[in-house]
């Protein structure tokens, strides 16, 4: 029988199977022998050992479309990164670090600013929101008032989406809104997963509707860019790409060079000043890291 790994704790893998049940499984020894580690999000073949106890064995991992390093998850279609408009105030540099990590791994990202009822939309628009200026689709939501929920549901439908963001921004509220009726049907998932002590520190997959899955990840308060040279950084700011052909120098870093298409676009308000300032800060951070 086929299914998806929705959680892995202490050598046990919890599989959401085709029959709608969740099976607690051990992986066969061949995976250890081959030094292969199943990941949350993997599609798997299982053999059922005890139907009543819902226990089984993972016999095969089906080919992965992709896999992320942070968070460690397989077969992801997109990332949905949530920050609050207020309480806590958005940390834009932290947001940009996350977006760069997704760009590095080739995963499209959508930005959600939650708690719309608390924030000043005009201020956020000035800083960040206009999509051509930040290079990403942006959604405003309020779980309190039900705003933006239908739009989010459309964005997530039919995909496996990593949901990420700092603690306290309303990630779990949005996830609960998305689950709707399926919360009743997958109550067994909740019961099974409560067996582990470490549930909040691990990523888990939540089935939302047919072919729609959310990968709930632990909240983050800091992220560090690794395995990157400072001259690569510009490749991970998608809004720069449109203006780079206007740069006089090939390999322009968009910092001190004359006749820079990106800096001209910035001066004309076509690129977010906030994003550009974060680019400069991260460029210096990577340069310092290389020095040591």
Question: Where are the language model's segments positioned?
Answer:
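Phosphate-binding glycine-rich loops and their immediate beta-loop-alpha structural context
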Residues: 86-134
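Short, Lys/Arg- and Gly-enriched loop/turn segments at beta-strand edges
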Residues: 51-61, 89-91
């Amino acid at each position: 029988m086929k299914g998806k790994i929705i959680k892995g704790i202490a050598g046990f893998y919890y599989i959401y199977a085709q029959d709608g049940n969740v099976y607690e499984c051990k992986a066969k020894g061949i995976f250890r022998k081959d030094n292969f580690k199943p990941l949350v999000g993997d599609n798997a073949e299982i053999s059922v050992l005890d139907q009543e106890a819902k226990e089984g064995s993972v016999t095969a991992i089906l080919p992965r479309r992709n896999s992320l390093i942070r968070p460690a998850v397989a077969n992801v279609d997109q990332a949905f990164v949530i920050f609050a408009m207020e309480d806590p105030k958005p940390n834009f540099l932290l947001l940009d670090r996350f977006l760069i990590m997704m760009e590095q791994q080739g995963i499209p990202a959508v930005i959600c600013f939650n708690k719309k009822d608390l924030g000043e939309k005009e201020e956020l628009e000035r800083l960040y929101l206009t999509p051509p200026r930040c290079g990403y689709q942006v959604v405003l939501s309020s779980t309190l008032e039900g705003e933006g929920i239908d739009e989010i549901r459309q964005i997530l439908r039919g995909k496996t989406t990593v949901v990420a963001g700092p603690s306290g921004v309303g990630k779990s509220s949005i996830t609960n809104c998305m689950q709707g009726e399926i919360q009743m049907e997958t109550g067994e998932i909740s019961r099974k997963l409560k067996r582990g002590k470490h549930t909040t520190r691990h990523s888990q997959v939540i089935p939302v509707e047919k072919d729609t899955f959310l990968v709930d990840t632990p909240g983050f308060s800091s992220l560090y860019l690794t395995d990157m040279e400072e001259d690569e950084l510009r490749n991970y700011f998608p809004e720069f790409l449109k203006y780079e052909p206007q740069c006089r120098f090939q390999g322009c870093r968009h910092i001190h060079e004359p006749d820079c298409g990106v800096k001209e676009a910035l001066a004309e308000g076509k690129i977010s000043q906030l994003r550009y300032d974060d680019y400069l800060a991260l460029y210096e951070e990577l340069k310092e890291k290389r020095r040591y």
